[in-house]
């Protein structure tokens, strides 16, 4: 997805994130994008309820609370970036 690629580029070149951190963001965002893709939900349509359903999805994968919190943190950053770039009109985390 172009938005993910642009965001990762921003993290690499503007924020100077490490390769391992970028790989983590890539993995976590890919999981979320696949989740919304299966439900035919666009980034613009993501709201509080989609995030809640994604949280259920993560819990069903038996991930640790720390890992789930990291996924959510990555998504918060991603949506903050998307709002700042005016790619989406609202942030489901605010």
PLM regions and their residue ranges:
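N-terminal core-binding DNA-recognition domain of tyrosine recombinases/integrases
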Residues: 4-20, 26-94
């Amino acid at each position: 997805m172009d938005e993910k690629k642009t965001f990762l580029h921003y993290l690499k070149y503007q924020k100077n994130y490490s390769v391992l951190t970028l790989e983590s963001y890539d993995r976590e965002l890919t999981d979320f994008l696949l989740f919304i893709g299966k439900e035919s939900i666009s980034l613009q349509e993501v709201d509080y309820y989609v995030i809640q359903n994604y949280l259920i999805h993560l819990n069903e994968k038996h991930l640790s609370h720390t890992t789930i919190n990291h996924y959510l943190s990555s998504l918060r950053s991603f949506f903050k970036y998307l709002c700042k770039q005016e790619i989406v009109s609202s942030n489901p985390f605010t």
